[in-house]
């Protein structure tokens, strides 16, 4: 399907791009100030000009790889506004500082959710559907918690610029093949560029599975993982659940919050909740307005759920930021409620 030449928006980020022929979208090369090649991928996370051998960030114009590393143009949205005056010689970009996270934090993480039995396992039970994600433009959101003083993003689902994140995570758990489930036909190299850009812009510690997704741009933290990727999307529509945002559980007892179920054949946006919520409301399912009144959740502009907790109670604070509490020989969780058992769906009238 071809488009008429003209201006449009990036399918992934929404920044201004120029559309020309055969559904190809590209950005303007910072060196020449014009379209150098039609081979720029429309889903490119980092734009590349093969003619000038330069790679740059389409969001802020920062040159990532070039002999002219620090000749960074600040390009206006439209080429008629772009002149040689837009090229400015800037100082080298500052390197993002990695937050100081004590070793006890990583030790506690390996023993508690989402790490179970010293392995990063699925937290969504066994109910993985055999369906595709219905809308390529719809992205599930991240699951944010606060461990001590560090904001943790359990899984990297929201693929958007950092300025749109509700919280800037210090630690990110990520399975690259899960990202690939929501970015169809995107090479793994592009996924690496995404993680690398997040690493540069936030300074977050990125935790990837061992023996998976070898990286060349940066060296992330590795952790044991037997986690299966989501090749086919999210949970299917649940007919018995008619109210968006009900709290329910899977067969493994993991407490969850389900988002809207538009219609049969489409998935429900489901994110993991804290056992703290389940301990408070395990006898009934609650309407999102009830949870909002208790400041346990909030809606985003995409009408999906963000979980903002004061704590993630399955991980005792003493294990996170107390060096003496990190006993390697102790494999049992100390303190904090244990994940409940039973997978019955409980509903209540709202």
Curated annotation (Swiss-Prot):
Region (Interaction with IKBKG): 106-111
Residues modified as Phosphoserine: 300-301
Principal location: host cell
Matches recorded under InterPro entries: Tax
Motif position, SH3-binding: 73-80
GO function term, MF aspect, one: zinc ion binding
Annotated region described as Transactivation, given as residue ranges: 289-322
Region (Interaction with CREB1): 1-58
Pfam families tied to this protein: Tax
Subcellular localization: Host nucleus; Host cytoplasm
Region listing for Interaction with CREBBP C-terminus, in residue ranges: 312-319
Source taxon at top rank: Viruses
Sequence similarity: Belongs to the deltaretrovirus Tax protein family.
Domain description: The 48 N-terminal residues contain a non-canonical functional nuclear localization signal (NLS). The PDZ-binding domain may mediate binding to PDZ-containing proteins and could be a factor of pathogenicity.
Name of the protein: Protein Tax-3
Native source species: Human T-cell leukemia virus 3 (strain Pyl43) (HTLV-3)
Gene: tax
């Amino acid at each position: 399907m071809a488009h008429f030449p003209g201006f449009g928006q990036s399918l992934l980020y929404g920044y201004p791009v120029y559309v020309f022929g055969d559904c190809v979208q590209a950005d303007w090369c910072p060196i020449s100030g014009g379209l150098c090649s039609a081979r720029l991928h429309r889903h490119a996370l980092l734009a590349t000009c093969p003619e000038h051998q330069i790679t740059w960030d389409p969001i802020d114009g920062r040159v990532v790889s070039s002999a002219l590393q620090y000749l960074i143009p600040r390009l206006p949205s439209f080429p008629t506004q772009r002149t040689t005056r837009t090229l400015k010689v800037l100082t080298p970009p500052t390197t993002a500082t990695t937050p100081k996270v004590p070793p006890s934090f990583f030790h506690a993480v390996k023993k508690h959710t989402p790490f179970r039995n010293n392995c990063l396992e699925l937290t969504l039970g066994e109910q993985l559907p055999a369906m595709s994600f219905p809308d390529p433009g719809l992205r599930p959101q991240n699951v944010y918690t606060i461990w001590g003083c560090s904001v943790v993003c359990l899984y990297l689902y929201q693929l958007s610029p950092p300025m749109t994140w509700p919280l800037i995570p210090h630690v990110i758990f990520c399975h690259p093949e899960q990202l690939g489930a929501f970015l169809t036909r995107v090479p793994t190299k592009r996924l690496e560029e995404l993680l690398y850009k997040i690493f540069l812009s936030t300074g977050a510690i990125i935790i990837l599975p061992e023996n998976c997704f070898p990286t060349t741009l940066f060296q992330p933290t590795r952790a044991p993982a037997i986690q299966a990727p989501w090749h086919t999307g999210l949970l299917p529509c649940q007919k018995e659940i008619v109210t968006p945002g009900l709290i329910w559980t899977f067969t493994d007892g993991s407490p969850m919050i389900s988002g809207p179920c538009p219609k049969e054949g489409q998935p429900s946006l489901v994110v993991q909740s804290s056992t703290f919520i389940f301990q408070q409301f395990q006898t009934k399912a609650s309407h999102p307005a009830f949870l909002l009144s208790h400041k346990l959740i909030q809606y985003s502009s995409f009408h999906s759920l963000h979980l903002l907790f004061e704590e993630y109670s399955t991980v005792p604070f003493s294990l996170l930021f107390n060096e003496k509490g990190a006993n390697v020989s102790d494999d049992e969780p100390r303190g904090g409620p244990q994940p409940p058992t039973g997978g019955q769906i409980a509903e209540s009238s709202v």
